[in-house]
């Protein structure tokens, strides 16, 4: 059974912060240049943000550049850091607070936000789609596709309806191919295609 395929300009594997920010920026640049650009983002999770480790302290300078009006657009950044402390824990029974002047500047989070990265990714996916991206949750890229000259030409999703022995069940459906001029791997630290 032959796989169905879709032709796009850019396919991005991974709908985390990096993949979605990339989709947004590429589409912003295309709009500025008055060029057509088809961007497709594949996410293995059943919904965007489902595979993101949740909590984070977020510094907004990158978001300020990417989407300057993020506050007006309802970005899920609601809880500002009002203070933070750093402790040394030499054993289970004692702790020592470092004086603030000894704490390295990058570890001071005053004015940053405490956020859910999953919620931020859901919101970034909305922004990317408003710009024209197609976002496909539940589409795990399983293999890299190569052209005859050895260049990457896209990715394919895994086949469905395959049993533990690798044999096709009655519900078998072949994976879907995404062919692209550019393939961007933003699958995170545990991504298997980038290995």
Each predicted region: which residue ranges?
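Glycine/serine-rich loop-strand microenvironments at binding/catalytic pocket rims
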Residues: 1-13, 17, 132-139
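N-terminal Rossmann-like FAD-binding beta1-loop-alpha1 element of flavoenzymes
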Residues: 9-40
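Extended hydrophobic secondary-structure segments that form protein cores and membrane-embedded regions
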Residues: 10, 38-46, 180-185
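Conserved Rossmann-like nucleotide-cofactor binding loop
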Residues: 18, 47, 190
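Predominantly flavin-linked oxidoreductase catalytic cores and closely associated redox partners
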Residues: 33-35, 118, 123, 127-195
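N-terminal FAD cofactor-binding segment of flavoenzymes
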Residues: 36-93
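Short, solvent-exposed loop/turn and secondary-structure capping segments
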Residues: 51-53, 99, 195
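Helix-loop-beta segment of a Rossmann-like dinucleotide-binding subdomain
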Residues: 95-117, 126, 154, 169
């Amino acid at each position: 059974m032959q796989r169905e395929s879709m032709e796009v300009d850019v396919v991005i594997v991974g709908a985390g912060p990096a993949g979605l920010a990339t989709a947004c920026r590429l589409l912003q640049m295309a709009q500025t240049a008055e060029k057509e650009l088809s961007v497709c983002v594949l996410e293995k999770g059943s919904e965007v943000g489902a595979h993101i480790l949740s909590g984070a302290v977020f510094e907004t300078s990158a978001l300020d550049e990417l989407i300057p009006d993020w506050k007006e657009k309802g970005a899920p950044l609601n809880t500002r850091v009002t203070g933070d402390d750093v402790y040394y824990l030499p054993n289970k029974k004692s702790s020592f607070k470092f004086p603030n002047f000894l704490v390295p500047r990058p570890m001071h989070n005053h004015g940053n936000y405490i956020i859910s990265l999953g919620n931020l990714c859901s919101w970034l996916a909305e922004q990317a789609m408003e710009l024209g991206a197609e976002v496909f949750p539940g589409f795990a890229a399983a293999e890299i596709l190569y052209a005859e000259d050895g260049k990457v030409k896209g990715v394919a999703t895994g086949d469905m309806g395959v049993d533990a022995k690798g044999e096709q069940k009655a519900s078998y459906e072949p994976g879907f191919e995404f062919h692209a001029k550019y393939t961007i791997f933003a699958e995170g630290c545990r991504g298997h295609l980038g290995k």
